[in-house]
């Protein structure tokens, strides 16, 4: 349809629409001329140059738009919960994945499971809160993927629940280094590899706590708010390199990380009461959102934070019972 319309315009140009020559591969170009009306001054004309869509961008098939075949991915913290679901989602869509975890035994078990499932997944031991280990991880990834990386999923995160005034310096440092400093540094390290891929995608795992107030989570929510703003800033800064930056912000998801707090039935009922869908989320419901943001089908989406929260973050006062 786009090609037909362009052909029609080229052969039957309406008034104020002109084609101009160009040495660019994106040609012909459209030159839209229009007049600014100013009652106090003589009218003047301006031009807007609109690059004509390339044949290759139109020719991509539907199957390719929803596939990660030929792409490489790094997922941090990929042996449990949301991280494991992300690894399996990306690998299932055809990506070659490298993941990391602190627990070597746990990592080896996961790698065995993935190998039996036919997934192309490798892994290495890494504590991403440690700067030198992050550097070693990215050296490994660069070697495995020959200097290119299409997808970076910064999944690792932790939480300490307590009133802000009770935080020790060590606890504050732990949350900041694990939740924010690690993702910031990994992005710095991954940038040359993402740029080399010509179509990079970074996805941060944020949280609804970056949008709304949650009890005893002032420090954790600060790290997630920082991630949300980093998402927006990097999306603009790295757009010139065709690297997209997005984030996914979950609410309570059924993982081992929240088992203890949700073992309190009264607390669980309160969680349900502020969640319009009235249930907890599943790791797969987060991983599918992450995968979408990595697919060619989402190639015009950047700088966005996608809430996977059953409607919690937009719920004002909408009681489940009248």
From Swiss-Prot:
One of its GO terms (cellular component) is chloroplast. Pfam families: adh_short_C2. It is found in: Plastid, Chloroplast. Gene3D superfamilies: NAD(P)-binding Rossmann-like Domain (3.40.50.720). Keywords: Chloroplast, NADP, Oxidoreductase, Plastid, Transit peptide. Substrate binds at residue 207. Residues 1-61 form a transit peptide. NADP(+) binds at residues 74-98. One of its GO terms (molecular function) is oxidoreductase activity. Its EC number is 1.1.1.-. InterPro entries: NAD(P)-bd_dom_sf, SDR_fam, TR. Belongs to the short-chain dehydrogenases/reductases (SDR) family. SDR65C subfamily. This is Tropinone reductase homolog At2g29260, chloroplastic.
């Amino acid at each position: 349809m786009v090609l037909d319309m362009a052909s029609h315009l080229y052969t039957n140009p309406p008034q104020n629409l002109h084609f101009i020559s160009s040495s660019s591969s994106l040609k012909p170009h459209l030159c839209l001329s229009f007049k600014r009306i100013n009652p106090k001054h003589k009218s003047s004309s301006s031009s807007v140059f609109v690059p004509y869509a390339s044949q290759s961008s139109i020719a991509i098939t539907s199957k390719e738009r929803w596939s990660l075949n030929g792409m490489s991915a790094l997922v941090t913290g990929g042996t449990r919960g949301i991280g494991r679901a992300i690894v399996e989602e990306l690998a299932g869509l055809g990506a070659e994945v490298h993941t990391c975890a602190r627990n070597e035994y746990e990592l080896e078990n996961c790698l065995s499971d993935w190998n039996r499932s036919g997934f192309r997944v490798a892994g290495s031991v890494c504590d991403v809160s440690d700067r030198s280990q992050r550097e070693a991880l990215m050296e490994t990834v660069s070697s495995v993927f020959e200097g290119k990386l299409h997808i970076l999923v910064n999944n690792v995160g932790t939480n300490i629940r307590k009133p802000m005034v009770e935080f020790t310096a060590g606890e504050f440092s732990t949350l900041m280094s694990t939740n924010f400093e690690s993702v910031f540094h990994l992005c710095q390290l991954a940038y040359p590899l993402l740029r080399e891929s010509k179509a990079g995608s970074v996805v941060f795992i944020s949280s609804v706590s970056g949008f709304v107030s949650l009890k005893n989570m002032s420090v954790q929510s600060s790290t997630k708010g920082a991630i949300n703003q980093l998402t927006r800033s990097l999306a603009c800064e790295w757009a010139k390199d065709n690297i997209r930056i997005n984030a996914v912000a979950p609410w309570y998801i059924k993982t081992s990380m929240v088992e203890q707090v949700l073992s309190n039935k009264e607390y669980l009922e309160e969680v349900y009461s502020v969640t319009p869908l009235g249930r907890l989320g599943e790791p797969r419901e987060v991983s599918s959102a992450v995968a979408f943001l990595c697919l060619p089908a989402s190639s015009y989406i950047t700088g966005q934070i996608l809430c996977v929260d059953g409607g919690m973050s937009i719920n004002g006062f909408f009681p489940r019972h009248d």
